[in-house]
Amino acid sequence: MKTSRRGRALLAVALNLLALLFATTAFLTTHWCQGTQRVPKPGCGQGGRANCPNSGANATANGTAAPAAAAAAATASGNGPPGGALYSWETGDDRFLFRNFHTGIWYSCEEELSGLGEKCRSFIDLAPASEKGVLWLSVVSEVLYILLLVVGFSLMCLELFHSSNVIDGLKLNAFAAVFTVLSGLLGMVAHMMYTQVFQVTVSLGPEDWRPHSWDYGWSFCLAWGSFTCCMAASVTTLNSYTKTVIEFRHKRKVFEQGYREEPTFIDPEAIKYFRERMEKRDGSEEDFHLDCRHERYPARHQPHMADSWPRSSAQEAPELNRQCWVLGHWV
């Protein structure tokens, strides 16, 4: 029983620790959702094709930078269109650049157009005003989720170290199961609220941020993996508590049945005889009392050298034992 309890406690502690590590990592990282954003290509400067996205050898190949350069030269000579407008032959998605981005609970980071480094903005500022309250509620739920995981982990460790005391271990086990279940429910609600806020932000967020395509990232997978480990730890803890209680009750029942002595036959003549002896209150009745005590607790009522009552033989001991029980002389 002790070995199985310890094994279940170790499994619950390991699952709770995994859930805590996954939840903390997901809460602090920015890869809950990731994808690409479509942004317009920067215009070509009048100084040549140095700032054009298709400059160099590729410009001649695809023929897209040459018209832009010609338009820039025409504008500089005064023969171009009024207002200095530049025309491009690019259509469709060719007019845009695609950059990668990844978003977490706290920040949204986007790749620079130059390809060097990232630019991060607060995701709370990007969320629509109607969703900021839900987002803050999600943040608070995530914090409570991690705190309750810490409390449950601490209680499980205490229960593991106090496994020798069954009663105290059961109390700690019950509280650890309750805190772990509550943390799992809070974590599930927090993850779902953040997902809802992100989907609304994709539709109603700033124009320069809205994703062209997106999917869930590894932080999102860690968050739900943490929830899975948390619920597995709570189920293991509840299972350990239930099995320990059942085993404890079963052993107690066996113990009580093994030590319960019920007489199978009562001799009326023996009852009458011993009642008469009790009424006389003579010295022989006292010897009978001592014989009964000696039969019940032989180590506690050892005779002294001066004692002279007759000891019961091996054949007489069961009968004397039964008669003493009948008359209620057990002490």
UniProtKB/Swiss-Prot annotation:
It is found in: Cell membrane; Synapse. The keyword Ribonucleoprotein does not apply. Component of the inner core of AMPAR complex. AMPAR complex consists of an inner core made of 4 pore-forming GluA/GRIA proteins (GRIA1, GRIA2, GRIA3 and GRIA4) and 4 major auxiliary subunits arranged in a twofold symmetry. One of the two pairs of distinct binding sites is occupied either by CNIH2, CNIH3 or CACNG2, CACNG3. The other harbors CACNG2, CACNG3, CACNG4, CACNG8 or GSG1L. This inner core of AMPAR complex is complemented by outer core constituents binding directly to the GluA/GRIA proteins at sites distinct from the interaction sites of the inner core constituents. It comes from Homo sapiens. Residues 1-8, 154-173, 239-331 are cytoplasmic. One of its GO terms (biological process) is regulation of postsynaptic neurotransmitter receptor internalization. Pfam families: GSG-1. Its main location: membrane. The chain crosses the membrane at residues 9-29, 133-153, 174-194, 218-238. InterPro entries: GSG-1 (IPR012478), PMP-22/EMP/MP20-like (IPR050579). Signal peptide: none annotated. It is a multi-pass membrane protein. Keywords: Cell membrane, Membrane, Synapse, Transmembrane, Transmembrane helix. GO terms for cellular component: glutamatergic synapse; plasma membrane; postsynaptic density membrane; Schaffer collateral - CA1 synapse. This is Germ cell-specific gene 1-like protein.
